[in-house]
């Protein structure tokens, strides 16, 4: 894949169940209040370490607030060598309304 794909929450959930990595690019405070269970917070400070440690061929779902910023982040990750990247349409807001039980609270790890 040379480009990322935009996907709805249902497809993102299916990818999660298959072991996809989910990264959340919202601000740290918002992430701490509520995020997709098992997701990792990703920002300008952590992205280099994330890329260095990541499996570039593993499915990667990028989440933001409403599905806009995640597209730019997904395109960047593709440019860094990731081969299977997805942007969550509707972002965390649509995710939360679709899968309210699949959310968690707490600070980024």
Curated annotation (Swiss-Prot):
Keywords: Cytoplasm, Transferase. The keyword Transport does not apply. It holds the Pfam family Rhodanese. The active site is at 64 (cysteine persulfide intermediate). Belongs to the GlpE family. GO terms for biological process: glycerol metabolic process. The lineage of its organism: Bacteria, Pseudomonadati, Pseudomonadota, Gammaproteobacteria, Pseudomonadales. This is Thiosulfate sulfurtransferase GlpE. It comes from Pseudomonas fluorescens (strain ATCC BAA-477 / NRRL B-23932 / Pf-5). Transferase that catalyzes the transfer of sulfur from thiosulfate to thiophilic acceptors such as cyanide or dithiols. May function in a CysM-independent thiosulfate assimilation pathway by catalyzing the conversion of thiosulfate to sulfite, which can then be used for L-cysteine biosynthesis. GO terms for molecular function: thiosulfate-cyanide sulfurtransferase activity.
């Amino acid at each position: 894949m040379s480009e990322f794909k935009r996907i709805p929450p249902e497809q993102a959930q299916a990818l999660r169940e298959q072991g996809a990595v989910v990264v959340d690019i919202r601000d740290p405070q918002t992430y701490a209040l509520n995020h997709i269970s098992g997701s990792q917070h990703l920002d300008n400070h952590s992205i280099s370490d994330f890329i260095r440690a990541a499996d570039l061929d593993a499915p990667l779902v990028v989440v933001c607030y409403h599905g806009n910023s995640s597209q730019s982040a997904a395109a960047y990750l593709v440019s860094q060598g990731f081969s299977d990247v997805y942007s969550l349409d509707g972002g965390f807001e649509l995710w939360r309304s679709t899968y309210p039980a699949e959310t968690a609270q707490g600070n980024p790890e």
